[in-house]
Amino acid sequence: MEWRRPAGTLLRILGVAVAYYATGRLGLRLHVSVEGAVVTPLWLPTGIALACLLWFGPRIWPGLALGTYLSIERISAFDLVDLGIIAGNTLAPLCAYAMLRRVGFRPELDRLRDGLALVFLGGLLPMLISSTTGTWTLVLTGDLPVASFWPVWSAWWAGDTMGVLLLTPLLLVLRRARLPRDPYRVAEAAALAVTVGAVTLTATRSSLSLLFLVFPLLIWAAVRFRLPGAAPCALLVSVLAITAATDRAGPFAGHTLLEIMVNLQALNGAAALTALLLAALVTEQDDIRQKIEEVCEDLAEVVARLAPPKE
């Protein structure tokens, strides 16, 4: 029995490394070059890293380091100074995990406080570590001029944060999600998915300013299907928007790279926050209403027992 525990941990570490590397390759397909540095508007491995830490605990951290190493090898030849990037990409999700555990975060994301904790303690704050160490590593190695620090740093930080906000909730809820039994709900879910894809594709490829049309659909997904419906829709919106931005198509045409990145990350951030926080709020309100109904039923039973019998 003793050998099974280390073997199981080793398999999880290797699985995390493979997942990190695979999603890293997907993210690099949508990369942009900021001041000569390769960055991606949506770095999916950070979402993988935090979700795996919440599932398996901090023991799988070597998988994060190995996955980062493999991702760096994909871009360029590995150098010892790249250990700074590996350290930052490993420490950032570990710090996110520690802070979330500290505040009593629940992976079910069924409370508004859990959604807010994931946004600030899981994404915005800890990803400062990976972006700062990574950008300074490029500066110290001479691969990036000091004057270009802030543009690269901001793009790095935004990409890592979006990976947490868009992918981590999806992974956490899909692990326990179940298909609805009602055929009408299944049909509604299919209609929602098709509509989100069609509207987002149109909005991101049209020269007209139609990006606002995605938000009523995200509200629909959050209200009707909670996070299991809202999270995939937000990720789909983000991927289609990033594809259009890298192609400089639709509303992203004719703009500088800085303008494109600002507009893109504003859209991605707003979509992620709308889906995550609204779904968490609706779920919390449903749970409160259900508990109130249960208390009322229990109270009615007590009153019925204490009431004097009728003559």
PLM feature segments, named:
Residues 146-150:
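Juxtamembrane helix-entry segments on the extracytoplasmic side of multipass membrane proteins
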